[in-house]
Each structure stands twice: as structure tokens, then as C-alpha cells.
């Protein structure tokens, strides 16, 4: 839906901008965390608007954690991009077979399409790097796609969680 698109673009742009400023000037941790949690709050409320307050609170923490998790994992050539591509392709293809979840597929496959050309240049030996701006954006986007998927169908939320396990286990 257009509203979900605005949430992804607005929140993604904000966290990417903070990541870019952090790459350039080394921002204080409290400021980065504040922006990540503020963006996560808006996204969680927007994507899970009918959910109980406890679920939204947990979603905010989970989304903020996903942003930091992906940023933390970024360091090896091709690692984050390949894992994110796997999550997006897996969720995108599986959601094609779930009635009413075509939007989940679209949002997941958009990131997959963006990651493929990036990976061409990020594959070892890397000639192009995502930095904090790219890593936090990918973390935010992956987290939002997971929340959106869970909001559309609980089974898709479980699929997203399973596909994210390489990030979780490696942390």
C-alpha cells in the first residue's frame, strides 16, 4: 500500500541519513539509538496499527534490535548483502503463495532487486561498501518487511524469523 511505502521510505531515509552522518562524523551512541527507536516507533505503530500496546512495544524493540544487528554484522565482504538477499528472496517467493500477501512479496523483492547490483561490487574482493548508512537502512527495511509480513499473516512473520536466523545466530 502507499502508506507502507511512505513508512519504509521516510524511516529508511532517516536512519540512513543518521548512518551517513555517523560514517562521516562519529555521532554519539545515544543520538543514533534515539533516531533508530523513534523511526522504529513510527514504523511499528503504522505497520501494526490494530495490535495491542504490548505487541507494538515489543515490535519497536525488535525493529531497533534488527537495525543494530544488521549494522553489527556488516564487516565481511558480501555477508550482509547475501544474507539480506536470502531473506528477501525467500520471503518474497513464499508470500506469493499466501492469499492477500502480495504486498509483502513486492516489498521484499524490491530490496532483493537493489541488493543484487550492490553485491556485484561488494563480493570479495569488495570494491564497494555499504557503511553504516547502508547497513542501518537494510536493517530497518528488513525489520519493517518482517513486521508487515507478520501483520498480513502470522505464518509469514514466522517465515521471516526463520530466514533471519543466520543474522541472529551469528551475532
Outline where the language-model segments fall:
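Divalent-cation-assisted or electrostatically stabilized phosphate/pyrophosphate-binding catalytic cores
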Residues: 171
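"…together with the soluble PPM/PP2C metallo-phosphatase catalytic core" -> "…together
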Residues: 1-168
